[in-house]
Amino acid sequence: MVRECFTFLNIFVLHSIGSHVWFEDPEVAWIDGEVEKINGQEVVIQATTGKKVTAKLSKIYPKDVEAPAGGVDDMTKLSYLHEPGVLQNLKIRYELNEIYTYTGNILIAINPFQRLPHIYDAHMMQQYKGAPLGELSPHVFAVADVAYRAMINEGKSNSILVSGESGAGKTETTKMLMRYLAYLGGRAVTEGRTVEQQVLESNPVLEAFGNAKTVRNNNSSRFGKFVEIQFDKQGRISGAAIRTYLLERSRVCQISDPERNYHCFYLLCAAPQEEIEKYKLGHPKTFHYLNQSKCFELVGISDAHDYLATRRAMDIVGISEKEQEAIFRVVAAILHIGNIDFTKGKEVDSSVPKDEKSKFHLKTAAELLMCDLKALEDALCKRVMITPEEVIKRSLDPQSAVTSRDGLAKTVYSRLFDWLVDKINKSIGQDANSRSLIGVLDIYGFESFKTNSFEQFCINFTNEKLQQHFNQHVFKMEQEEYTKEAIDWSYIEFVDNQDVLDLIEKKPGGIVALLDEACMFPKSTHETFANKLYQTFKTHKRFIKPKLSRTDFAVAHYAGEVLYQSELFLDKNKDYVIPEHQDLLGASKCPFVVGLFPPLPEETSKSSKFSSIGSRFKLQLQQLMETLNCTEPHYIRCVKPNNLLKPAIFENVNIMQQLRCGGVLEAIRISCAGYPTRKPFFEFINRFGLLSPAALEGNFDEKVACQKILDNMGLKGYQIGKTKVFLRAGQMAELDARRAEVLSSAAKKIQRRIRTHQAQKRFIVLRKATISLQAICRGRLSCKHYDNLRREAAAVKIQKNGRRHYSRKSYKKLHVASLVVQTGLRAMAARKQFRFRKQTKAATIVQAQWRCHRAISYYKKLKNGVVLSQTRWRGRLAKRELRKLKMAARETGALKEAKDMLEKKVEELTYRVQLEKRSRGDLEEAKTQEILKLKSSFEEMRKKVDETNALLLKEREAAKKAAEEAPPVIKETQILVEDTKKIELMTEELESVKVTLENEKQRADDAVRKFEEAQESLEDKKKKLEETEKKGQQLQESLTRMEEKCSNLESENKVLRQQAVSMAPNKFLSGRSRSILQRGSESGHLAVDARSNLDLHSHSINHRDPSEVEDKPQKSLNEKQQENQDLLIRSIVQHLGFQGNRPITACIIYKCLLQWRSFEVERTSVFDRIIQTIGHAIETQDNNNTLAYWLSNTSTLLLLLQRTLKASGAAGMAPQRRRSSSATLFGRMSQSFRGAPPGVNLAMINGAAGGGADTFRQVEAKYPALLFKQQLTAYVEKIYGMIRDNLKKEISPLLGLCIQAPRTSRASLVKGASRSVGNTAAQQALIAHWQGIVKSLTNFLNTLKSNNVPSFLVRKVFTQIFSFINVQLFNSLLLRRECCSFSNGEYVKAGLSELEHWCFKATNEYAGSSWDELKHIRQAIGFLVVHQKPKKTLDEISHDLCPVLSIQQLYRISTMYWDDKYGTHSVSPDVIANMRVLMTEDSNNAVSNSFLLDDDSSIPFSVDDLSKSMEKFEIADIEPPPLIRENSGFSFLLPVSE
């Protein structure tokens, strides 16, 4: 067991009766009490527990009664740096859930045994980022940040050493360190998993295979781990490596109750059912390696859930699915190997599997390891001995077989763990170019149990090495402190443990060397090893031989004496694998198993050099120390507050032992050897200035004043540095004793004066009370006599009035009864007469009404039938028309395409009709000419035939005459022959003429037939042309109707309208009237003649010559419009200023867009150009004047659009209600498509001087306009956020100065009369910081007002800024204990009054509810400065004083409060206890546990909010800028008078 060997320096301390002291107690370590009597070297103490104790004067220590109620966050600030002071400070802070405490730059972390997520969230990491050590409350993040900043700034590697016993929280602390370093040096994911992600996720994997439940801890690391996190030049994590030390292999086979084996075995047994069946597993109690303990499950831990989490972590660190399957197959094989039991075989000293169950597990293990079943059995039951002559197989007895089985299991598990570490390192990767790293060492703390074996020896050897490194570091820090303060001092004695290290590691005579020597001899036993130790170290002061044991030995470590049992030292030190096991697993069919047992190199197998666990561990430790010596160390000492592993339990004795083991008390001893008490000058003067009033009244420097105080007290050996007073041990107690005497004397004088004053006051009160009592008695008697007289007079008066009342009452009763009877009789007669007349008149009226009713009923029935028929018919027509209108509204694009097609078809048909007309005329003309030709040719042919017949007749007659006058016969015959020939020729010619005539007749008949066919075809074409014209007319009418239904006309009509607008105002008005008539016609209010005029007008436009409409006018107008847009863009780039608090730029843009009808077109580039212009203008984000100017213009333009534009099809719809919850405007883009508030005054838009005041118009916006509105909304948000963030950046440094000002600008307490001047200067210096904030706020307000930013936006900006101030000040207050003081509360309260005054001056129009946003800091400061806190109840604090603060925030500020002005205390312990109860009830709610505030950077308004907040204004009289004023294209911008 550990024996205390640490004592503090025995320094004589002056004690007096009434002094508060600490004395030792065997049960609770230290108890405080008050000295009652001093007898030489003994004192009688009245303990706070009620008992009286006698103790030696040298064994008691002074108690600081003025120590803060909440302790100090750095124990070097303790007035008395000794064991009880350290223990009490840790206990106080632990009770307040302050688990971290500094001792210089050493962080002590006490395990709370409960989750505290609020102190590890991202917001807390942000707070500690870049904060100097000690500025904020102690935290593990602060140590990590200091290491990281030192590495970045100095370029030197750093290390963080986390130590502590099992269960102290080392593993969790290491996780938080790595998480914070990943937060500082992390980068965005680029290719798969990041280095920091893999490093963090390696923890669950290594915990699963290297952690186990022990007696002291449910998740104890059974190996040492050193994580090297490498960083590149930019400070980003670039690589990492994990090094492990001394895995506890024996735990695989041997565990004790109530411990557990490694977590992975239980995780695998809780795996999904298919995996359990696959590996043939069951409940953990069925396996020998697990059922040696009755603990199978951990409270609050799900092994099934952790198994899946481990598999996910394996995926992240790069272990493939196949490798994971092989890993858990090997783990399952180890469990089955442990269930193989052996019994004696047939041969002597042989063994075989015991039963079928053992054979089953043997077979399963062989299957899982994929090795030969027989070979596995032989490897467990036999040994092979190789001699020069032969190979001998030797059987093992059952006990040796069990040892062989366990050896195989330990070897396989050890190789598996080493493979995991190598795999993780390969997966993470190391950066060869990295020059700096931060190493995080998570290693076992000092251990001492009832049974301490080889593992405890190695662990304590490691801690001895680290303690030497720690002592050197602390000694170095002390030297640096003294050198920094420039004091004269002799070098303190360095506490060294080199003798213990020589005892363990010295060659050749150290314990490790002797153990290796014993392991090399086969016949060595633990008895021979122990005897060797006894002989070698019998004179060593650190080595102890027990009296009652022959094999045990003890070593006096720095933390105490530890007794080791040497029985298993030799077996555990041997580092070799049985050849049969190596051969068996090297021949496995599983590549993974073969990889765990690679073949040994030939030289290694032939080498006879012995290798041991101890030597290898010593070499690893040497390498670790070399690495640590090359780094700048930072220390975290983890402490376990109790062995029950429960929260809110603080075991003093246990913690004192851990502080010794962790070297914390050793560091305090080093400090006590020099100057343990160090007080800054102002604190020293605050506390001890009353011992020498002359030093305060003189005009002295603080340093000189401290010197005079110490000289007056007659102290020797102290030192005064540059900023602090250094006191030797015991001097602080002497000063406190002198101070107590002065205070006691002053208290007696005060008590005497107060008693005199109270007695005098009591006498005066008593005399005054006596006189008052006498006066009251006399007055009472007089009043009683007066009452009697008054009662008698009253009785007489009552009797008189009573008699009169009764008489008058009886008379009135009789008079009323008479009147009632008379009235009744007269009324009865009148009613009877009235009833008769009424009945007569009613009969007449009934008859008349009945006749009228019958006539009206018949008429109404007939009328209702007619109206019903008409209504249904009109309803059917209206529904039909409504469906068409809806279809047209939804299919505007389709209508436009149909319209274009119809226009093309009309043009085509028109062209075809004209072509047909021309072709018909040509055909008629050709037919006429052809008929004429045929007639003329026919007449000619007829004439030729007549001439030929006449000639033939003449020739016949001539022939007859010739025959008659012929000569002789021959002559006549020749003549006859010649005539005959001529006749034949003539006949032939006649026949040919007849044929020709017949042909001509046929051609004439064909021409006539064709002419008749052409006439018929022409008639058909005429009919078709008429039908076509009729269809064209119908199409034109349909086209006209579609034009009336569509909200946008085609581009040709738009150009014609613009031309008409620019040329003649009357035409523009007519076009405007036309659009109004169109909307009126849709509502059913258009007259018939107006509709006909509109149709004619539309018809005339659509039937113009295309060359006239589309070519020249459109081209010229587009060019002119482009020029106008360019001119507009050039003008708005300039700072146009404001006119009548209205931004000119926004108004000009709006009027131009409205005039050009840009909101109603499907395509336009003007919106993009305007947006680009705004974007270029705000590129300089630090120019607040420019940002404010454009915020004013964009918000005004957005307001105009919001009130003017509406989505297509939204006419007549009710305005959409505003969003119920919206974080940002841009996040609610759909809101831009909702209907705007009804109506925009045309007088405001068009510049009309009069009339039209009751006319409202909204524009149905197309997609580009709606998109422009969305972009404008985004720019309003962006510019607003830029202005707000610029103001935040400007005031952030000032806020830091404000909260730190009380520490840096406190006035000196010395220098006599100049103290008031110093106080005034300090107050002015503090207020200067707040005035700097006020000045920034005022400048921003003036900038926003000069640019006419809407007051609504100004209020939102300052509301968020004040919320930011509230968050920053409040968080700083809760994270800095020195800020939670009474004086600091007064300072901050004075600064807040400056902000309140600013809000008052800014008026509610611009400041709004800004002052209310400071409610958290105001109430917190109110708590700091309120008096008599101990008398306040929790209800008063939480409901009256600080109703806004949560219970966590109240608890934090109550525990951190300290009164540096009056020395009063915080709230009562009962209130603190009640707060802790309430916090425990809410412990499951992570959000409620957070005491810090979050800064809200969202956009706190919507478009509707902005629209409703801004009043309507006229833009008709806005003067255009000179650049566009003279341009005729912008004449519409000029007022009407011009």
Curated annotation (Swiss-Prot):
Taking the record's annotation, the residue ranges forming a coiled coil are 892-1064
Q: Where is this region: Disordered?
A: 1017-1041, 1098-1121
User: Where does the Dilute domain lie?
Assistant: 1168-1481
GO MF annotation: an example:
calmodulin binding
Q: Where is the composition biased (Basic and acidic residues)?
A: 1017-1032
The Myosin N-terminal SH3-like domain covers which part of the protein?
16-65
Domain Myosin motor, by residue range, is: 70-740
What domain of life does the native source organism fall in? Eukaryota
Write out the residues that bind ATP.
164-171, 217-225
Sorted alphabetically, the keyword list is: Actin-binding, ATP-binding, Calmodulin-binding, Coiled coil, Motor protein, Myosin, Nucleotide-binding, Repeat
Offer one example of a GO biological process linked to this entry: actin filament organization
Any Pfam family the entry gives: Myosin_N
Q: Which family does it belong to?
A: Belongs to the TRAFAC class myosin-kinesin ATPase superfamily. Myosin family. Plant myosin class XI subfamily.
What the entry says about domains is: IQ domain mediates interaction with calmodulin. The tail domain is a globular cargo-binding domain.
Instruction: State the function annotated in the UniProt record.
Output: Myosin heavy chain that is required for the cell cycle-regulated transport of various organelles and proteins for their segregation. Functions by binding with its tail domain to receptor proteins on organelles and exerting force with its N-terminal motor domain against actin filaments, thereby transporting its cargo along polarized actin cables. Involved in trafficking of Golgi stacks and mitochondria.
Subunit structure, per the record? Homodimer.
Q: What is this protein called?
A: Myosin-9
- List the taxonomic lineage: Eukaryota, Viridiplantae, Streptophyta, Embryophyta, Tracheophyta
